[in-house]
Amino acid sequence: LSRYQGLIYRKKRVGLLFDLNKMSNELSKAIQQLKKRQTVNGSWPWFEGMPDDRYITQYIVTGFGHLDHLKIKNIRENGEVMEMVQRAIQYLDNRIQEDYEWQLKHNKSKLNNNQLGALQIQYLYARSYFKDVLLAEKNKTAFDYYLKQAEKYWLPNSRYLQGMIALTLNRYDKTAKAVAIMKSLKENSITSEEMGMYWKENYERYFWQEAPIESQALLIEAFDEVANDTKSVDALKVWLLRSKQTQNWQTTKA
């Protein structure tokens, strides 16, 4: 019996090694595709030949941040990848500067009002993975403005964006506010033995910032990193697994 179990174990190990090698090869191919499709200004389009797109560029930068954060790939030790990321971040820093300049020109008397949108929140979150990448002096005022906006106006946003804000603020040492956001998220959640922990808004909607699977996954990250709440993390994972069992996940990111 022990010999048979050992054989099964070794087969599983070989299978795991094959999967890891497959993942590594696929990741290398994806990186080469991204390098090929990155435009001269550092952005990425949705598809080759299309105009640059801010959302997809932030999406890709966040993806690289996740790979590094989860230690799947050390981005900073890969010069080719880090150069792509730095160029993309420079593009995104310039776009946030454009947002701020638009507010100064058209909304100067209302700068203290809520001028925070989903793209600005996504930018702050993507940028928080790469604090070591230089933020040009010319872009610092714009960055600080939107970071303060996120700290002040987090509540009207979707659960997904609230989680992004909590993670961002925590990484920029605004811990008290980040913890307060996590407390609010927990208080507004639903927990059951069968379905785990989730929110009543967890159903498919139109906008990317309301996607339920992506929201749940990001909130797992937030409850782990910001709240250090393993019990909630486990309960959140239950909902995610139940969702996978009962329906097809609707998006590529899911």
Where do the protein language model's features map onto the residues?
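Large, well-folded core regions of big proteins
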Residues: L1-A254
